[in-house]
A protein has these predicted regions:
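Metal-dependent phosphohydrolase cores
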Residues: 1-156
Length: 156
């Protein structure tokens, strides 16, 4: 219901949308990078954070406020029914709260290559960006993202 609400509210949105395809793209990209980096973050934690990270956008669109906080609040209420314990819920909700904003993609890749320890929120944030195909977007030239923030090619 919450996801359908976001999709309905974004039906005529010109820029990036936040539907199921986006949420799954973020989860898959995060999971691949975490596997590549050998980070100690479980698949179900990654997917939970990814699937909930934009779920509060409907509330944000309708009443204002920060979608990160709204998404974390929704996750906090629903995750216990999904079998997550308090520690996991805190980890997931903290990552959701910190996922907004954009990173310089090149700088992030340098951190990965230098084996710097990254948190779930770091992976969620960069995956949120990398899930966007800016290189194939018809409105990329009017997007508010800087060129360093845009996903300008297919990452391999």
């Amino acid at each position: 219901k919450l996801l359908m609400e976001v999709e309905d509210l974004e039906e005529n949105r010109e820029y990036c949308r936040h539907g199921l395809e986006h949420l799954l793209d973020v989860a898959r990209i995060s999971y691949i990078m975490i596997l590549e980096d050998g980070a100690d973050i479980s698949k179900d934690i990654i997917y939970a954070a990814s699937l909930f990270h934009d779920i509060g956008r409907g509330k944000s669109y309708q009443s204002g406020g920060n979608h990160d906080e709204a998404s974390a609040d929704i996750a906090k209420k629903l995750l216990p029914d999904c079998g997550y314990n308090d520690k996991e819920i805190i980890q997931i909700c903290d990552a959701i709260k910190l996922h907004s904003g954009r990173l310089d993609i090149g700088e992030f890749q340098n951190k990965r290559e230098e084996n710097k320890e990254l948190e779930l929120a770091d992976y969620l944030k960069i995956s949120d960006q990398l899930s966007r195909n800016c290189f194939n977007c018809k409105v990329s030239n009017t997007c508010k993202w800087s060129e360093e923030e845009k996903n300008s090619n297919i990452q391999i």
